[in-house]
């Protein structure tokens, strides 16, 4: 974060939530309309871009050249990436998923979960799902890493900022449970517990992505790649929603291990 700039987390998150919620609740309504269901994604996509758009506006209007240069550098400078972390970037989520499947078997989970899913767990009428997963990772991390997280870290310790960010990131997805054919809509219709598990799983995920981003000198492109790989890995195997509950527990253990490993960094006092 830039010490010469005064971040405004309240303005950022309030603006992002208001814009996203208005667009996504509108899109949710249109997704069930026989007349407009084919174009509801035109409303949803700007909502997905809101974290990035608000971040860009605040940075552009800041009149702080150091802040602007820092954003551009973290977005395009590949030298920020620590090559030693690349194996973790690519292998962490597959390892978590495979371990979760193994742990599910004594509780009745099927070994067929090790098979490739052969498709995606949700559908859209407008944008290919794989492209949507990439868009989600890109626009979210451009906003979250471009301004949002730094704004929280300017006020709080890394640990508290990570917890707050995870809560905000989780709640940001809330309107999606009302969007026809969305992943969140599908799992909530299967079971409210599956839906709640989705929101809960975001909390440790926020800590993990934040830690990985910091270990790569806040590289935004690295955060985008890591986020996309997480999204993609969640769709590759035929993992059940029951196993995803176990997966959330594993993610919490991973997040806890990361915090203990870098305890000094997470609890370092400001100033």
Swiss-Prot record:
The annotated consequence of residue 141 to A reads: Decreased enzymatic activity to about 15 percent relative to wild-type
Q: What are its GO biological-process terms?
A: CAAX-box protein processing; proteolysis
Activity regulation reads:
Activity is unaffected by metalloprotease inhibitors 5 mM EDTA and 5 mM Zn(2+). Activity partially inhibited by 1,10-phenanthroline and 1,7-phenanthroline.
Q: Which residues carry the site feature described as Transition state stabilizer? A: 227, 231
* Membrane topology term: Multi-pass membrane protein
Any one GO cellular component localisation term in the record = membrane
Q: What positions constitute the catalytic site?
A: 140 (proton donor/acceptor), 173 (proton donor/acceptor)
Give its localization: Cell membrane
**Listed transmembrane segments:** 10-30, 39-59, 83-105, 126-149, 160-179, 193-213, 220-237, 244-263
Q: What spans does the record annotate as topological domain Cytoplasmic, numbered to this chain?
A: 31-38, 106-125, 180-192, 238-243
Matches recorded under InterPro entries: MmRce1-like, Rce1/LyrA-like_dom
What GO MF annotations does this protein's record show?
A: endopeptidase activity; peptidase activity
Chief location of this protein within or outside the cell:
membrane
What PANTHER family is this protein classified in?
Answer: PROTEASE, PROTEASE-RELATED
What biological function has been recorded for the protein in this entry? Protease involved in the processing of a variety of prenylated proteins containing the C-terminal CAAX motif, where C is a cysteine modified with an isoprenoid lipid, A is an aliphatic amino acid and X is any C-terminal amino acid. Proteolytically removes the C-terminal three residues of farnesylated proteins, leaving the prenylated cysteine as the new C-terminus. Hydrolysis depends on a farnesylated cysteine residue and no activity is shown towards geranylgeranylated peptides.
Protein name per its UniProtKB record: CAAX prenyl protease 2
The species is Methanococcus maripaludis (strain DSM 14266 / JCM 13030 / NBRC 101832 / S2 / LL)
Underlying gene? rce1
């Amino acid at each position: 974060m830039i010490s010469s700039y005064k971040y405004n987390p309240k303005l950022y998150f309030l603006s992002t939530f208001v814009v996203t919620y208005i667009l996504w609740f509108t899109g949710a309504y249109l997704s069930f309309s026989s007349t407009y269901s084919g174009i509801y994604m035109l409303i949803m996509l700007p909502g997905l871009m809101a974290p990035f758009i608000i971040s860009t506006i605040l940075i552009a209007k800041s009149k702080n050249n150091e802040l602007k240069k820092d954003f551009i550098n973290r977005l395009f400078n590949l030298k920020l990436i620590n090559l030693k972390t690349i194996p973790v970037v690519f292998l962490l989520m597959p390892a978590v998923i495979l371990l979760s499947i193994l742990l599910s078997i004594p509780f009745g989970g099927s070994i067929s979960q090790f098979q490739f899913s052969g498709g995606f767990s949700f559908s859209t009428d407008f944008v290919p799902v794989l492209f949507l997963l990439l868009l989600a990772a890109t626009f979210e991390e451009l906003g979250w890493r471009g301004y949002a997280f730094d704004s929280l870290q300017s006020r709080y310790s890394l640990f508290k900022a990570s917890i707050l960010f995870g809560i905000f990131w989780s709640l940001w997805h809330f309107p999606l449970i009302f969007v026809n054919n969305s992943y969140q809509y599908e799992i909530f219709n299967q079971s409210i517990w599956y839906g709640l598990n989705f929101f809960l799983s975001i909390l440790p995920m926020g800590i993990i992505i934040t830690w990985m981003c910091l270990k790569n000198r806040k590289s935004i492109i690295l955060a985008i790649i890591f986020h996309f790989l997480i999204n993609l890995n969640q769709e590759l195997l035929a993992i059940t929603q029951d196993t995803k509950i176990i997966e959330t527990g594993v993610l919490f253990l991973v997040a806890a291990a990361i915090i203990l490993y870098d305890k000094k960094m997470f609890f370092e006092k400001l100033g």
